[in-house]
Every structure is written in structure tokens, then in C-alpha cells.
Curated annotation (Swiss-Prot):
Keywords in alphabetical order: Ribonucleoprotein, Ribosomal protein, RNA-binding, rRNA-binding
Family label: Belongs to the universal ribosomal protein uL6 family.
Source species of the chain: Corynebacterium kroppenstedtii (strain DSM 44385 / JCM 11950 / CIP 105744 / CCUG 35717)
Subunit field text: Part of the 50S ribosomal subunit.
Single GO BP term: cytoplasmic translation
Function statement: This protein binds to the 23S rRNA, and is important in its secondary structure. It is located near the subunit interface in the base of the L7/L12 stalk, and near the tRNA binding site of the peptidyltransferase center.
UniProt-recorded name of the protein: Large ribosomal subunit protein uL6
HAMAP family: Ribosomal_uL6_B (MF_01365_B)
Molecular function terms, GO-annotated: rRNA binding; structural constituent of ribosome
Source taxon at top rank: Bacteria
Annotated Gene3D superfamilies: Ribosomal protein L6, alpha-beta domain
GO cellular component: cytosolic large ribosomal subunit
Length: 178
């Protein structure tokens, strides 16, 4: 029995949910998100709650049950509050600059790296080493943060690189010379 899938999704008063077959569209103060729910899962709106149910207890139905409920909940939270991921850069000469709505990174390569903001994503730069990624789609914000982090992953020996704010990197001891 899916503990996540069985709990209904609460819908605030300023959010409108439209269910059209397997398509769910959520409109809120920050924007609109839509998703196609996989086939065996059924969605129904009961008052100010969305109930996600499955027809049987097959393994695939059970896994899609919790997934569908979580995706709908993430959409409701996204259009009301939004999602923000804060990141920081460590390293001598490593910095980030805001170029309009885009970010330009200087990460020790021979060229600067320009990251364009996808539609629905905004960047905020705080100083030269801290920035944040904001948007209403949790998956898009998280994927963009992971792609930016991959530009210069943290070095366990020197501690240089891009990391999430508050992330602790396990440091390694270097070779001891004679």
C-alpha cells in the first residue's frame, strides 16, 4: 500500500486545478504547469483536494501511484511558492556574473562559460561567489542546478568547485612526500 499515494493533495484557494482525462493542469499566482499522468492511475478532485488512486496492486501501478501524487503535489507547491536552489563557488579566481538574464562563469578554464536561463527560470547573483536558481518547475530547477554543478565539480583535495549551499565535501589527505 502506497503511503504517499494514498494521502490526498491539498489545493489552496488561489490555485485552480483542471483535470481532463489523464492530463492535469494547475494554475496559480506564479504560473501554470501541466502533466500527463500514466495510464492506470486515475485522478479525481473532491472539494479542495485531489485524490490519486490506482485500479490494482500490480507492481507498476503501485510505483506510478506514489509518483503521480508527488508530481501533482510538486506542481501545486511550485505555482504557489516556487522552488529555489542556492549555490556557491569556492576557488581562487572562480566567480559568477549576471549578464542580463543569463549567468557567466569564470571557473579556471581558458574561456568563460555562459548559461542561458530557460523559460520560467530566473537567476539571482549575490556577490561574486553565490547565486540562486528559482522557478516553478521543481524538476527543471533541480536539473539546471545539477548541470551547473557539473561544470566544475568539487575537488576533494583542495575544496574548489561549485556546490549547493550548506553542502559538506569530504576532504581527502594528499600524498605525503619524502
Amino acid at each position: 500500500m502506497s503511503r504517499i499515494g494514498n494521502s490526498p493533495v491539498a489545493v489552496p484557494s488561489n490555485v485552480t486545478v483542471t483535470i481532463n482525462g489523464q492530463n492535469v493542469e494547475v494554475k496559480g499566482p506564479k504560473g501554470t504547469l501541466a502533466i500527463d499522468v500514466p495510464e492506470p492511475i486515475t485522478i479525481a478532485q473532491e472539494g479542495d483536494e485531489i485524490v490519486v488512486s490506482r485500479p490494482d496492486d500490480h507492481r507498476k501501478s503501485r510505483s506510478l501511484h506514489g509518483l503521480s501524487r508527488s508530481l501533482i503535489n510538486n506542481m501545486v507547491v511550485g505555482v504557489t511558492e516556487g522552488y529555489t536552489i542556492k549555490m556557491e563557488i569556492f576557488g581562487v579566481g572562480y566567480r559568477v556574473l549576471a549578464k542580463g538574464s543569463d549567468l557567466e562563469f569564470s571557473l579556471g578554464y581558458s574561456h568563460p562559460i555562459l548559461i542561458k536561463a530557460p523559460e520560467g527560470i530566473t537567476f539571482a547573483v549575490d556577490g561574486q561567489t553565490k547565486f540562486s536558481i528559482s522557478g516553478i518547475d521543481k524538476q527543471q530547477v533541480g536539473q539546471l542546478a545539477a548541470n551547473i554543478r557539473r561544470l566544475r565539480k568539487d575537488d576533494p583535495y583542495k575544496g574548489k568547485g561549485i556546490r549547493y549551499e550548506g553542502e559538506q565535501i569530504r576532504r581527502k589527505v594528499g600524498k605525503t612526500g619524502k
